[in-house]
Amino acid sequence: MSEKIYDVPAEWAKRAFVDDAKYQEMYASSIRDPNGFWAEQAKRVDWIHAPTKIENVSYAPGNISIKWFEDGVLNAAYNCIDRHLATRADQTAIIWEGDDPADSKHITYRQLHDEVCKMANILRNRNVKKGDRVTIYLPMIPEAAYAMLACARIGAIHSVVFAGFSPDSLAQRIKDCDSKVVITADEGLRGGRKVPLKANVDAALNKVDNVDWVVVVKRTGGKIEMNPTRDLWYHEAAEMVTTECPVEHMNAEDALFILYTSGSTGQPKGVLHTTGGYLVYASMTHQYVFDYHEGDVYWCTADVGWVTGHSYILYGPLANGAVTLMFEGVPNYPDNSRFWNVIDKHKVNIFYTAPTAIRALMQGGDGPVTKTSRESLRLLGSVGEPINPEAWEWYHRVVGDNRCPIVDTWWQTETGGILITPLPGATRLKPGSATRPFFGVVPEIVDADGNTLEGATEGNLCLTRSWPGQMRTVYGDHARFEMTYFSTYKGKYFTGDGCRRDADGYYWITGRVDDVINVSGHRMGTAEVESALVAHPKVSEAAVVGYPHDIKGQGIYAYVTLMAGETPSEELRKELVGWVRKEIGPIASPDQIQFSQGLPKTRSGKIMRRILRKIAEDEPGALGDTSTLADPAVVDDLVQHRQNRKEKQA
């Protein structure tokens, strides 16, 4: 834990929306009178019918129900586009920066309106109605924003699938939410390489039969197959429709989107967010956490395939009339200066990225950063996983020239928006700490039995109060919603994260405590990777755990037992890595595979993951009690053949 403290720069305290006194006052008000507080915040969006009911929430076992602003009526796309046309039609809404540094464009709010209406009319003409699901499998191109906002405009529910997922993962997600339409591109571009998106969609649709239409955006012009009865080119369909499309009236509790996240059971969960509460919360957190002022150029480097892209590239910034940058590329293409060149090119003021990217660029040294100016920057942010103090210090010193505060934000797909975070004009910073709760958020640290722990302590992080951005259910499976988040500690939302609170009341996230690994800020269920490995004909059994990784935060460590007669080899190791890439996607590739004669199991057959974690972390002396194992000799073999020895890496 870092002992350093960075005070709020005086000029920040002066110009920010919130200084420390204001934070204390607003936070106290949000806890004392949540209905009054959130009724006031609800005014930041335009309502067709303003809500009179603010919060209606139950965390009671068997009756988990979350409703905010439930009698209000609005439209998210109207709030992100139309309401800005009177005052900023010609202001840039989206700066798009392509994979190729020579490829960029500015899209104004008026242009955004016209393009979204065209996409919405294409969908309406294909009989997409309010409540229908649309799967979006696109690269980071403007059409991804058009597609999401077009769905919001007509009341369809979008399900964005990250374009790095495999055909099998895509098929699973299309089937689970019963999508009528898939919107994709011929190919994606990433780091100079082509990604076969349409071919992946074709492969996925061989496994499902619920899709009527595939809308294809021409990105590269590469050769693809088109099914004449199902597939249509976006650019051709767009020529046949108008740039006007009336907005659907949406109840605040009507669904806005589904976003799949890894679960510990291996079956992805469709996290469902609704319209009113989500939009209010995304807008509010974007304004206060990033201290967004009119005219600022704001860049969140996430992909819209993840929740950070939903809340902090699209909905939050656009609801606030912001200039938001959308980046198709990767941090190290064409070289390690790419992020910093983009900041200089577009005069970016606020920069929000992941610790994984920071750590990877840090390995390339200071040179690629210091040869750029970055003088436009005034605020840095971190998201996706805890940031280690060394990376925090480098980010602050080298990228921010010791002058830009860092907002180290903690939240989840399920929370819709940021929950624990510094506010740049209000919060003294400690490297590695997410610091204090946002307005209305009440964290509680509990022990394994659910007892509340007070003061400076460490345990499991729960939240005792609801907030408007909270997910409402797991799509199609409310019982799973209750089981996953509310059954461990009754009457509380359990985050699945461990947490430490220091003597100053600052929160330090210590990582997942369930069977989910956080790889480069993206959650990956261990069961999902295990299922992929066991599907290989040569694999009898597999167990997957996380271990500390210098770049990714956590790496994937797989223990694999082979079928009788099969022999471990380097070739088979590579084959299994490729197999998992194909089954799930590159993000799930194991970093280490250890072939094992068996796995440590209790006499009842339960795998002792605690032991596997310690071996993967190269801590064989900390295995604890192994007497309950059916065959303790298995552990000796695993320790002897472990892949992640410190001396091996030296």
Curated annotation (Swiss-Prot):
One GO CC term, this protein: cytosol
An annotated GO BP: acetyl-CoA biosynthetic process from acetate
UniProt PTM: Acetylated. Deacetylation by the SIR2-homolog deacetylase activates the enzyme.
Binding site for ATP: 384-386, 408-413, 497, 512, 523
Name of this protein: Acetyl-coenzyme A synthetase
EC class of the enzyme, as a word: ligase
Organism classification: Bacteria, Pseudomonadati, Pseudomonadota, Alphaproteobacteria, Hyphomicrobiales
Gene this chain is encoded by: acsA
InterPro entries to which the protein is assigned, alphabetical: Ac_CoA_lig (IPR011904), ACAS_N (IPR032387), AMP-bd_C (IPR025110), AMP-bd_C_sf (IPR045851), AMP-binding_CS (IPR020845), AMP-dep_synth/lig_dom (IPR000873), ANL_N_sf (IPR042099)
Catalytic reaction list: acetate + ATP + CoA = acetyl-CoA + AMP + diphosphate
Cofactor(s) annotated in UniProt: Mg(2+)
Signal peptide: none
Function, as annotated: Catalyzes the conversion of acetate into acetyl-CoA (AcCoA), an essential intermediate at the junction of anabolic and catabolic pathways. AcsA undergoes a two-step reaction. In the first half reaction, AcsA combines acetate with ATP to form acetyl-adenylate (AcAMP) intermediate. In the second half reaction, it can then transfer the acetyl group from AcAMP to the sulfhydryl group of CoA, forming the product AcCoA.
Pfam families: ACAS_N (PF16177), AMP-binding (PF00501), AMP-binding_C (PF13193)
Source species: Bradyrhizobium sp. (strain ORS 278)
PANTHER family listed in its UniProt record: ACETYL-COENZYME A SYNTHETASE, ACETYL-COENZYME A SYNTHETASE 1
Family: Belongs to the ATP-dependent AMP-binding enzyme family.
